[in-house]
Amino acid sequence: TDLVQYYGDLLTRLRMSSQSGVEIGMFGTISSGTIKRILIKLDKGQKLTEKEQTIYDTACAEMRKIIPQPQAPGAFPTGMLLGATWNREAVHQCASAVGREMDAYHVDVVLGTPNVNLHRDPLNGRVFEGYSEDPCLTAQLAPEFVKGVQEEGPLANVKHFAANNQETCRHSINVRIGERALRELYFPGFRACVQEGKVRSVMSAYNKINGESCAMNHWLLTDVLRKDWGFDGFVVSDWGAAYDQVKALSAG
């Protein structure tokens, strides 16, 4: 097709390092440089990305021991690719490599490893992060990623708890759902990470469940996570989700 031919032509114009940069997209660092080589000029969004990266680089250079910045990070399979292996050992080995690399960069907590949200919407731009649409397969593989990372030193962090399965309106959407569906579909991956993987950190989601924000949901974070499953680690909210800090702390 014309589209295949178009992108095939683009790839022939890129060096291998540039191809990797486009695929990885680390804060736009390598990607923006690649775009500049194949386009006449950057648009406003691309210029903003480049400016943000400059600020980030400067901050990291000044605070190298506090904010580690990977200079040549490895490129690892996405959750969807790992899920397609149906192979616990392969997932464990991949996670071990991630853990070793993060430890080398003095990273204490590897956020979002793993993402166990199910594949429910093909239009979800982040669906590739999760393992599968199948809660059973997810519950088999995710604990292996947790163990692989934590055996190397850094703490794993499983996200987004819970029922966070679309990007559209993800900061405000209210998921109206019964407890049976939660426990049979959306909880198994998290429960396996807690009870089998011994994950030390959980990230709460932006969305609400039956009217109650996940980041400030006592039933979710205390009754289910801590009392039912025995979790004794710490919960972090997704970025800015705990807008009522007192309620969030009280919720667990």
What are these regions (language model features)?
Residues 1-252:
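Glycoside hydrolase catalytic-domain context in secreted enzymes
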